[in-house]
Structures are given as C-alpha cells and as structure tokens.
C-alpha cells in the first residue's frame, strides 16, 4: 500500500473520531510554550493576533489533514520555542540588539524567475552571507551542553517531507545548508506568505495585506542580529560581512521592508510571467497536498495568477515611486545607481558573472578577483542556471496563455521583457533549479 493511501485511511479514521474538526487554539499553544518562562517568554514580540488569524483560517479554509494538523502544531511550537530562546539570549546579552545590519541586499521579483540562482551566485563572494535553512529552523544550538546536531537533524526533516511530497526536490531543491528565503524568518511572528503557500488561507492573507508586514521585518532585522552576533563569538566564522537575502514575497511589502531596513538595496529579477505562473501554481499544489485533504489545482492556478498580477503592478509602482513610496524611484537613493537594480532572467542565464557585476556596479560595490572567480566557477557548474526541463499544461491549472499574456501586458511592456517561446497550450519548464 502506498504512503498516500495510508494517509487517506488515517484521515478517514481521524475524521470519524472528530479529530480533524477540533479547534486549533492559539492561546493554548502560546500557554504551552510559556509554561517554563512565564508571560515574558517572548519579550516584546506581538504574536497573539497573527497566530490566531492563521490558525482560524487553517481550521476554516485549509481542510488540514491529520499530517497537516500535526505539522502545523509542530511548526507553531517550534517558532514559539525559537522566540523564547531569542528573548532569553537577549536578556543574557543585551549587546545582541546593538549589532549593525548595514545595507543588506534583498533579491526579489516574480517567483521562478531566477531569484534563487542569483542569490546563490551572490553568496559565492566571501563577504556575502545568508541565513541557511538549518539556522532558520534552529537559530541556536541546544541548551544544556547537548551535542549540536542541527544540520543533520534538519536534513532528516527535509527527507521526511520529500517522502510526503516526492515532486518537491525537482521544483525547489533544498538541503539544510542551502540559503533560506526570508519568508521562513518572517513566519516566526506568524506574518508570512509562507503560510499562504502551504495552506489555503485566503482570510489570513487578506488580513496580512491589511495589517502590513512591518512587525515581521523588524523581527527579521532582530533575527539577523542574533545570527550575526554568533558569528563574532570565538571559534565562529569571522566577520559580519554583508547580508544578501531573498524572497519573491518582498514585492508585496516593500514599504514595510524599507521602513525596517532604510538602507536596503533591492534587486528585481524580471522574467516573462507566462513562463513562470504555471510553475508557481505547480509548486503551490505540491506544497499543499501533504497537509490538506483536498487541493484544487484550478483554484490555485487562478489565484496565483491574480496574486502575481498584483505583485507585478507593485514592482512597477516601486520603480516609479521608490520602494518606500517616497517618490525616490530608480534615479535616486543609495549607491551609484539608485535604490533598485533591475535584472532580466535572460541576461542572468546568458552571462551570470556579468549579472553579478551589474548588481555590484549598480550599488557602487567592488567585486574583487577572488569573488569573481568564485562566481564564475559556480555558474560553470550550473549551465543555463541549472535549469531542468519539464512541461506543464495551462488547462490543468485553469489558465489560458493568451489571457495570461494580456493580464501581464503592462508589466511586460514596462520592463521590456521578451516573451519566451513555447508550445501554445503548455509551457516548457526550464527554471526549477534556478528558481
């Protein structure tokens, strides 16, 4: 019997027992996490409302499976445990909050457009670094002198997820040592579109759009201070260096990002949306299936298209008005070329080193010969950006390529994006490894 069949049987039994209809109680989970440290366990981090909004939406809209309920509970308790540990570390060493997070680079743009590929290339420069998957899951080693096995533990957790979602590695390869997206950090305070990717939670997403992301970005800054402070300790990696961060979801909250990181340098990666929207829908479906009793690919496809049409409009607006909405667009701001650097997917794949040089040049930074050699070497190991080849059908996700082309027309024309060739009713995926 397949694993999927076993899980369906487990869901049916849990449903009959009333387990799947039980309330997901935010207050109870917070109380459990606080039981050893009292009301100040999380310091001044506001979490009650966003967690309640998330859990209510999951219960009412996502149709969580038995595995999904267990995973959600584990996730919430893990995030709360990390918040407790961060607060305890700050109480023991208040200088953590003095760590300067200077002029970080944020890579963003449409998902599946090459943002991960560019992110990895930028991280080849020795002075650049990013939070790794294992650090966002467990930012501090175990207490009590226990052996630090975080990397091995996270690799085992990822392997377990792959057993539930065998298509995932082909869409988004991930290991414990891989650079992680900012969405996983923002999720600690339960204000992250990471939850929208994993769960069908339209009411939570609508609330997040209204409430804004400033508390989440302020927390991200704080989280980076903790990681940076650990790098300064004896025996740790030397130096603070430059943070290079990445997440497509930043396009929805650029004003809040800029408020938390006033000197942020932002890179937009542009690609033909018709070539990526199908892959976004596919990835979302793959992420949701292990955790939900039912997944509707057509609803996902149309929802992702609408969402990223909004993202495209916000990128145009930020380019005109500036990421802070202050009227300072591309022609003003930080560094040599302004606050936003624009790259096209085609130029990134055709000349990866040239694309990295363009980012450095735009922000008035120097790419030294050692870094150039490292970037060139990494690019040579990933020909065509490390892209895989596959094909998806638009109809499977309720999409029509002609309608998508028209829906994204303004964005394509604004940034002068060349359409990519492909079959009329399908799109050849050449982006999984570099997404």
Task: Name each region found by the language model.
Residues 243-246, 268-270, 342-345:
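Short beta-strand segments
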Residues 106-126:
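Glycine-rich phosphate-binding P-loop
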Residues 1-88, 202-217, 224, 228-232, ...:
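PAPS-dependent sulfotransferases, especially Golgi type II membrane carbohydrate sulfotransferases
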Residues 124-134:
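Post-Walker A helix-loop "phosphate-sensing" segment adjacent to the P-loop in P-loop NTPases
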């Amino acid at each position: 019997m397949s694993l999927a069949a076993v899980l369906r049987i487990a869901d049916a039994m849990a449903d009959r027992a009333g387990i799947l209809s039980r309330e997901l109680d935010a207050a109870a989970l917070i109380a459990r996490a606080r039981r050893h440290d009292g009301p100040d366990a999380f310091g001044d981090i506001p979490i009650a409302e966003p967690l309640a909004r998330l859990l209510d939406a999951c219960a009412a809209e996502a149709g969580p499976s038995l595995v999904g309920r267990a995973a959600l509970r584990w996730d919430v308790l893990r995030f709360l445990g990390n918040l407790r540990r961060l607060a305890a570390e700050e109480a023991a060493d208040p200088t953590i909050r003095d760590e300067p997070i200077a002029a970080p680079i944020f890579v963003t743009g449409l998902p599946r457009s090459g943002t991960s590929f560019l992110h990895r290339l930028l991280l080849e420069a020795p002075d650049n670094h990013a939070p790794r998957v294992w650090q966002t899951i467990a930012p501090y080693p175990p207490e009590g002198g226990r052996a630090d096995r975080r990397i091995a533990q996270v690799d085992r957790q990822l392997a377990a997820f792959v057993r539930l979602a065998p298509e995932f590695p082909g869409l988004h390869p991930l290991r414990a040592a891989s650079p992680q997206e900012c969405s996983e950090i923002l999720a600690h305070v339960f204000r992250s579109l990471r939850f929208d990717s994993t769960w069908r939670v339209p009411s939570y997403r609508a609330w997040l759009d209204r409430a804004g992301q400033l508390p989440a970005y302020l927390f991200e800054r704080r989280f980076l201070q903790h990681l940076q402070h650990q790098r300064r300790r004896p025996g740790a990696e030397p130096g603070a260096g430059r943070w290079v961060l990445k997440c497509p979801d930043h396009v929805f909250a650029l004003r809040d990002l800029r408020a938390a990181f006033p000197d942020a340098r932002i890179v937009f990666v542009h690609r033909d949306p018709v070539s990526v929207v199908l892959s976004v829908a596919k990835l979302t479906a793959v992420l949701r299936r292990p955790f939900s009793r039912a997944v509707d690919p057509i609803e996902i496809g149309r929802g992702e298209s609408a969402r990223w049409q909004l993202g495209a409009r916000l990128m145009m607006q930020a380019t005109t008005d500036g990421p802070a909405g202050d009227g300072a667009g591309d022609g003003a701001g930080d560094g040599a070329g302004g606050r936003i650097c624009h790259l096209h997917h085609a130029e990134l794949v055709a000349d990866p080193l040239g694309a990295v040089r363009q980012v450095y040049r735009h922000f008035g930074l120097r790419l030294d010969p050692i870094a150039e050699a490292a970037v060139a070497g990494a690019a040579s190991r990933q020909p065509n950006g490390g892209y895989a080849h596959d094909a998806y059908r638009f109809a499977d996700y309720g999409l029509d390529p002609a309608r998508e082309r028209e829906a994204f027309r303004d964005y394509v024309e604004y940034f002068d994006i060349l359409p990519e060739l492909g079959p009329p009713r399908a799109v050849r995926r050449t982006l999984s490894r570099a997404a």
